Structure formats: C-alpha cells, structure tokens
Amino acid sequence: MRLVLSLGLGSALAIAVVAITPILSERTQWARALHAELEGLISPLSTKEITILALSSGLAEEMFFRGAMQPVLGLLFTSAVFGAVHVGPRKVLLAWTTWAFVMGLSFGSIFELTGVIWGPVLAHVWINQRNMTFIRRH
C-alpha cells in the first residue's frame, strides 16, 4: 500500500512539474534564462543519452539524498544540500538551485510520508527526462 501511495504521489508530482515547465519558460524571465542556459548543454544530446542521464541521475540522487542522507539529517537540511549541489557557474543558474531546493522538499516529503523511495525516484527520472527533452526541442 505504501508503495502504491509513493508511486501515485511521485506520478502526480511529475505530471504537475512537467506541465508547468513550458508555462514557466514562456511567462517568467528566470525560467527563460535558465532554459537558455541549459539548452546549450542539453541540445547536443540524443534521446537515448537524455534517457540514460535522467535514469542515472534520478536514481543515484534519490538513493543518496532521500535514501541515505534524509533519514539521518532530515528533510530541510537534505533539501538544502540537494539545492546546493545544483549550483552552476553562472548567476542565472541560481534559479536552478532554488528550483532544486523546492524539488528536494517535494521528493523528500513523498519519502517522509510513505517511507518508500520509489515514488521520488519515479518523479525525479520522469521530470528530468521530459524537461531535458523539452529544453532540447524548444
């Protein structure tokens, strides 16, 4: 039952984030700037490479941050560290750091609520794959 809840919440989160990404990119300066910055990194990647990157990063980050770190250090601190590792070399990427902190809180809340890592893993992989694909295509 907890697995089903975790996967359901992860799916709902992923659907919401993937749906809001194009809206934010169209309507907010910070999302447009972030999109433009990441486009140079993502546009050369093939669909296969994006999928491998999404799978490996989503699984590894969730296992480390939610699976290993959060039970010891708590939701807020783990989310702050998650955001901090998403710091880029340019100021425009500060929005990515903030977004990563919020996503860390979201992934971590699903884990806190259910005690199951697979919903956050599903959400993280899904969001990464769809949003990288969106950035590459637009």
Describe each PLM feature range.
Residues 1-57:
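Juxtamembrane helix-loop-helix connectors linking adjacent transmembrane helices
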Residues 30, 41-138:
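Transmembrane helix-loop-helix hairpins at the membrane interface
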